[in-house]
Amino acid sequence: FNPCPYSDDTVKMIILTEQNKKQDFYTLDTIGEHNQFNKLTAKSQVVFIVWQTGIGDAITARAGYIFLLDSGLAMLVDKYQMAPVASDIKLCNAGCYCKPTYVISVKKAIQFAWEHKCVGIRCSDPGVPTDGLSGRPHYGETLHKVRSYNGK
């Protein structure tokens, strides 16, 4: 049993289109290869950058924004001047704890992720606190392939 539905080394994006609420999955490579940058931002109600912590069914959609799912990204959010949203806006993992959620523009977030080749938390990271049930991290103390707290 793999508690982490996105366990490979690719950032997944979930696109919720207004027409049918269908979830379309993209990778950054796909976006780059097909030059879908503007097309994605134009057609998308919501774009989620999923940092491999697993989101289950507990998605709270807000049209026109990107949700960064990791409080460990606070440093990056601050560094690149992406404003955190009000503290009462939360996004919860199914079976996990609520995590602070940051909202930035769709275009800026896709550009940021593309430039930095961002890859998020792995469920199997040693030394990362988990909830003891699913094996998923609490608040994403480490990031991989991104400049992070522990320098990995």
Curated annotation (Swiss-Prot):
Catalytic activity: a 1-acyl-sn-glycero-3-phosphocholine + H2O = sn-glycerol 3-phosphocholine + a fatty acid + H(+)
Main location group: secreted
One GO term of the biological process aspect: lipid catabolic process
Subcellular location: Secreted
Name listed for the protein in its UniProt record: Orientotoxin-1
EC id: 3.1.1.5
Keyword Lipid metabolism: yes
Organism whose genome encodes this protein: Vespa orientalis
